[in-house]
Amino acid sequence: MIKVGIVGGTGYTGVELLRLLAQHPQAEVAVITSRSEAGVAVADMYPNLRGHYDGLAFSVPDSKALSACDVVFFATPHGVAHALAGELLAAGTKVIDLSADFRLQDAAEWAKWYGQPHGAPELLKDAVYGLPEVNREKIRLARLIAVPGCYPTATQLGFLPLLEAGLADPSRLIADCKSGVSGAGRGAAVGSLFCEAGESMKAYAVKGHRHLPEISQGLRLAAGTDIGLTFVPHLTPMIRGIHSTLYATVADKSVDLQALFEKRYADEPFVDVMPAGSHPETRSVRGANVCRIAVHRPQGGDLVVVLSVIDNLVKGASGQAVQNLNILFGLDERMGLSHAGLLP
């Protein structure tokens, strides 16, 4: 069994990790930390986990206990993993970080977007960006994995086939993305209150969202050149889900885009390219580690529209983290993740 530690288990990504790992036949959660909830039983805080973690309680983070684990997940706000990751890596423990701490390769760029100096720039050279559909072989050999964000996952998977094939104009990319309220986290905030978010939709961070440099970094690597991206996120009155409507200019009308996408993702267990003319729904991926994609060329013109949907807490966070765990430890990539989405 893989001995697992989780730092920061009281947020939505933390409890989603617990839910997924409870179904994993080769992983056992030995340590879960929370300074504010130390001593509280996991099953008392999350009744949905009763019968799965009845002997596990939250504890104050202890480097010795965490270093005894084979792998430690960080489901924490940005900046926390900076302080602990180096010590764990030195002890031989693998680190899978769900926060943004090691996603950007440039420490100065990270500091610009997150408003504080990067706390462990010396570790950036060791960090592998954990998008399996791009970096699977690097993940197998990694010590430190940076799990992609939710918007970046849906957006990159949608654009990748076009950019890798050199078909899309890289200077004219648009990502119009909608997120459920759980993407804002579990902390109390006026904008996340039911009376504020219900029956309403709004754009936010139009001047620049923290996921913009992460998306741009990935698309730039895929295109092999600089890219121009307009990214506009929206908050929608649902709990889970990301819906990305992606626009790219593709002048070559002879290309069979459906075949291109199907070929690119033919061997990917968690990317579902839907039949031509489809419109994927966020509800179809709720609770599942799946990205569903459909590609369109409206009116046969130069503009290509890609629709990409994920569950922000699963393929956009905790599910993708477990997918990385499976790859890292040489397991079947689908282990503990093959359940279907929840309907209705």
From Swiss-Prot:
GO biological process: L-arginine biosynthetic process
Recorded GO MF terms: N-acetyl-gamma-glutamyl-phosphate reductase activity; NAD binding; NADP+ binding
Reaction equations catalysed: N-acetyl-L-glutamate 5-semialdehyde + phosphate + NADP(+) = N-acetyl-L-glutamyl 5-phosphate + NADPH + H(+)
Keywords: Amino-acid biosynthesis, Arginine biosynthesis, Cytoplasm, NADP, Oxidoreductase
Active site: 150
Entry-linked CDD domains: AGPR_1_C, AGPR_1_N
Assigned GO CC terms: cytoplasm
Amino-acid biosynthesis is among the record's keywords: yes
InterPro entries found in the cross-reference section: AGPR_AS (IPR023013), AGPR_type-1 (IPR000706), NAD(P)-bd_dom_sf (IPR036291), NAGSA_dehydrogenase (IPR050085), Semialdehyde_DH_NAD-bd (IPR000534)
Highest taxon of the lineage: Bacteria
Cellular compartment(s): Cytoplasm
Pathway: Amino-acid biosynthesis; L-arginine biosynthesis; N(2)-acetyl-L-ornithine from L-glutamate: step 3/4
Enzyme Commission number: 1.2.1.38
Protein function: Catalyzes the NADPH-dependent reduction of N-acetyl-5-glutamyl phosphate to yield N-acetyl-L-glutamate 5-semialdehyde.
HAMAP family cross-referenced by the UniProt entry: ArgC_type1
Family affiliation: Belongs to the NAGSA dehydrogenase family. Type 1 subfamily.
Name of the protein: N-acetyl-gamma-glutamyl-phosphate reductase
Species for this entry: Pseudomonas putida (strain W619)
Lineage: Bacteria, Pseudomonadati, Pseudomonadota, Gammaproteobacteria, Pseudomonadales
Gene responsible for this protein: argC
